[in-house]
A protein has these predicted regions:
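Peri-catalytic and regulatory segments of divalent metal-dependent proteins
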Residues: 1-109, 125-132, 139-173
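Phosphoinositide system proteins, centered on phosphoinositide phosphatases
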Residues: 111-118
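Active-site-adjacent, His/Asp/Glu-enriched structural segments that form or flank metal-binding
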Residues: 118-121, 136-139
Length: 173
C-alpha cells in the first residue's frame, strides 16, 4: 500500500457524489492505493475500493478515474463479492463429480476416459466462472453509466478507460 494525501483527497472528492447517488455512506467506503504499475482497481473486504497506482498514472484525465470509481461502486451495490463466492461453489460441484467419475475410470483401467472426465470438469468450471465474471462486469458497467448520468458527469471517461484496458489486453495476448 502507498499513502498519498493529495491523491486520497482527490479520490474522495471524485467518489463522494457517486457514493451518495448509489445510496452509500461515503464514510463507510474505504479507498486505498496499491503501489503497482498495472491498470487495475477492485473491490475487496466489503466496501473497500483499491486502486493500483498505474491506473491513476495512466489515466489521461479525472473523468477516466471517476468512471472507474463508478464501475467499482457498481460492484459494491450489485453485491458482486458475496455472489462470487457462491458462484465458485456452484461451479465446482460438476467438476467434483467429474473428478470422482474420472478417478473411478482411471482405477477401472480406462485412463483416456478418466483424464477426459477430469479435464472436461475443470473446463466447465472455467467457462462457468468466466461467464459469471463477464456478467458481473457488464452489470457494474451499466450501474456506472447510471451513476455518472445521475450525477451529471460524462460517460466519456469510462468509455476511454474501457478502450485503454481493451488495448492493454490485446497487447498482452
Amino acid at each position: 500500500f502507498i499513502r498519498d494525501a493529495e491523491i486520497e483527497n482527490l479520490l474522495a472528492d471524485y467518489s463522494r457524489p457517486l457514493f451518495l447517488a448509489a445510496g452509500l455512506n461515503p464514510n463507510t467506503v474505504g479507498i486505498a492505493l496499491i503501489n503497482n504499475k498495472s491498470l487495475n482497481a477492485f473491490v475487496a473486504n466489503g466496501q473497500n475500493i483499491y486502486f493500483h497506482t498505474g491506473l491513476i498514472l495512466e489515466s489521461e484525465d479525472p473523468n477516466m478515474v471517476i468512471g472507474v470509481i463508478a464501475h467499482e461502486i457498481g460492484h459494491i451495490i450489485g453485491g458482486h463479492l458475496s455472489r462470487k463466492a457462491s458462484a465458485i461453489d456452484e461451479a465446482q460441484r460438476p467438476a467434483l463429480v467429474a473428478t470422482i467419475l474420472g478417478l473411478g475410470s482411471l482405477l477401472a483401467g480406462a485412463p483416456d476416459v478418466g483424464l477426459a472426465l477430469i479435464t472436461g470438469g475443470q473446463h466447465v468450471v472455467q467457462r462457468k466462472f468466466l461467464s459469471f465474471n463477464r456478467a458481473q462486469e457488464s452489470s457494474a458497467d451499466v450501474i456506472a453509466l447510471r451513476l455518472l448520468e445521475d450525477t451529471g458527469q460524462s460517460p466519456n471517461g469510462i468509455i476511454r478507460m474501457m478502450d485503454m484496458l481493451a488495448d492493454q489486453e490485446i497487447l498482452s495476448e
